[in-house]
């Protein structure tokens, strides 16, 4: 009988979480949703010195923003210490683990001798009990580590969903330390107990964990557990071809929100960063879940491309509801000194966003473009001298008069502009640039007729006439 699918995301809360990290949450989340399974969030916080609540909060916030909801958790390893100690005691009792009194200095010296002899550095089993073997006398006052009694012969084999069949000889593995002298369990041991207790069927994680896998499988087999399906994802590289990391300039997940990216764009981009469905580039979350499978995970490192993410974000911004974008733009407007009170004095923000979004790649850019509608214009003096010339001023006066009488629609404003151009024998840039400067304070705006309609008749006419007075 096939076990119900149970996947997990098991981050260590030791600081920074970037797109490469969160991809290891996206894929198991998608697989669990596709298979109508369970997605578990486990916080691997046994590294007490480096773990922090701030880092946990960053993980939770990033997952929530991207819509990666979990069915169980967060489960904290530090809250499961009694369970780990229980399993350690059982392993000691069954001879699956043993105390080792070799000091760190002795182990270093052993490894140095092995290196000098051209051998692979490894623990030599000095304290491993064997039939007929006489063990050294335990040194007084020394607390031992606990080591797992790894098989001496045979091969660890698993069919990795990404890497294919992997075989590691047990002769390559030494007896892994599974508990420190103070009794606290080691990462590789905790992971096995957790995966076994939580019934994890599929482990989808970065390939930096490949070397841990044979050790974890051996411990799992010793405990009578059933190994999950493993899928080790190739590394995510930054734009310079280095492994993505904070040290190499990676942005945190929430920094993308703060830069004005939409979560659906980031999810779409992340989905393609190591998985594919034919040539499909743009797809919804629902399509991604429907299409996702382990067979189409990439086998080569994926390289981050910021311009591709920006292109996707621009697409999703164009598709997004104006009211939603308006709410998302407010914090960016506030950072520009434009609060709700200022917004209330200008045109409807939904309408402004609707005009600006076709030119934007981020919500931040929408806000920067929208700001002109809620500020008193302060055009550059040199720009005024360049565009509001004596040749243009009569046309501006006539345009103001025409706009006073025109219907306030885009079509009517466009007709007034064209009629003024014809009367004064000007080209559109000559008139449009000066109008943009006087009304909006900048020469960079969308279509002039659409911009003027949003500013409103009174504002447009008043600002043009004030400049001519």
Swiss-Prot record:
Xref: HAMAP family: Glu_tRNA_synth_type1 (MF_00022)
Gene this chain is encoded by: gltX
Function: Catalyzes the attachment of glutamate to tRNA(Glu) in a two-step reaction: glutamate is first activated by ATP to form Glu-AMP and then transferred to the acceptor end of tRNA(Glu).
Taxonomy of the source species: Bacteria, Pseudomonadati, Pseudomonadota, Betaproteobacteria, Burkholderiales
Residue ranges annotated as motif 'HIGH' region: 11-21
InterPro entries registered for this protein in UniProt: aa-tRNA-synth_I_cd-bd, aa-tRNA-synth_I_codon-bd_sub2, aa-tRNA-synth_I_CS, aa_tRNA-synth_I_cd-bd_sf, Glu-tRNA-ligase_bac/mito, Glu-tRNA-synth_I_codon-bd_sub1, Glu/Gln-tRNA-synth, Glu/Gln-tRNA-synth_Ib_cat-dom
Identification of the protein by name: Glutamate--tRNA ligase
Domain of life assignment: Bacteria
The UniProt record lists the keyword Repressor: no
Keyword list, A-Z: Aminoacyl-tRNA synthetase, ATP-binding, Cytoplasm, Ligase, Nucleotide-binding, Protein biosynthesis
GO CC annotation terms, alphabetical: cytosol
EC number: 6.1.1.17
């Amino acid at each position: 009988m096939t076990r119900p699918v149970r996947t997990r995301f098991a981050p260590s809360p030791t600081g920074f979480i970037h797109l490469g990290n969160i991809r290891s949450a996206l894929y198991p989340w998608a697989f669990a949703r596709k298979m109508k399974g369970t997605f578990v969030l486990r916080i691997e916080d046994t590294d007490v010195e480096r773990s922090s609540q701030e880092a946990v909060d960053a993980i939770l916030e990033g997952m929530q923003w991207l819509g990666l909801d979990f069915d169980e958790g967060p489960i904290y390893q530090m809250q499961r210490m009694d369970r780990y100690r229980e399993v350690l005691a059982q392993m000691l009792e069954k001879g699956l683990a043993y105390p080792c009194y070799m000091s760190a200095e002795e182990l270093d010296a052993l490894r140095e001798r092995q290196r000098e002899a051209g051998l692979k550095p490894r623990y030599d089993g000095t304290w491993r009990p064997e039939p007929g073997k006489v063990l050294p006398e335990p040194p007084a006052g020394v607390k031992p580590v606990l080591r797992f009694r790894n098989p001496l012969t045979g091969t660890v084999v698993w069919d990795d969903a990404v890497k294919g069949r992997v075989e590691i000889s047990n002769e390559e593995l030494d007896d892994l330390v599974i508990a420190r002298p103070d009794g606290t369990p080691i990462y590789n041991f905790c992971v096995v107990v957790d995966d076994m207790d939580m019934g994890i069927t599929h482990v989808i994680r970065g390939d930096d964990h490949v070397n841990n896998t044979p050790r974890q499988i051996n411990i799992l087999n010793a405990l009578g557990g059933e190994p999950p399906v493993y899928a080790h994802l190739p590394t995510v590289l930054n734009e310079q071809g280095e492994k993505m990391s904070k040290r190499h300039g990676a942005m945190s997940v929430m920094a993308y929100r703060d830069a004005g990216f939409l979560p659906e764009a980031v999810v779409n981009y992340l989905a393609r960063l190591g998985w594919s469905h034919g040539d499909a580039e743009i797809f919804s979350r629902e399509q991604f879940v429907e299409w996702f499978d382990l067979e189409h995970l990439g086998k080569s490192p994926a390289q981050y491309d910021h311009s591709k993410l920006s292109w996707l974000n621009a697409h999703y911004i164009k598709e997004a509801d104006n009211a939603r974008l308006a709410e998302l733009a407010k914090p960016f407007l506030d950072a520009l000194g434009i609060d709700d009170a200022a917004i209330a004095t200008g045109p409807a923000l939904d309408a402004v966003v609707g005009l600006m979004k076709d030119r934007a790649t981020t919500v931040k850019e929408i806000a920067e473009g929208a700001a002109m509608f809620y500020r008193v214009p302060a055009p550059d003096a040199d720009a005024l001298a360049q565009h509001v010339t004596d040749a243009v001023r009569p046309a501006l006066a006539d345009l103001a008069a025409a706009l006073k009488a025109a219907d306030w629609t885009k079509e009517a404003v466009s007709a007034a502009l064209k009629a003024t151009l014809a009367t004064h024998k000007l080209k559109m840039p000559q008139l449009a640039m000066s109008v943009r400067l006087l009304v909006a304070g900048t020469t960079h705006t969308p279509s002039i007729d659409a911009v003027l309609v949003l500013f409103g008749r009174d504002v447009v006419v008043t600002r043009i006439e004030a400049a001519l007075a």
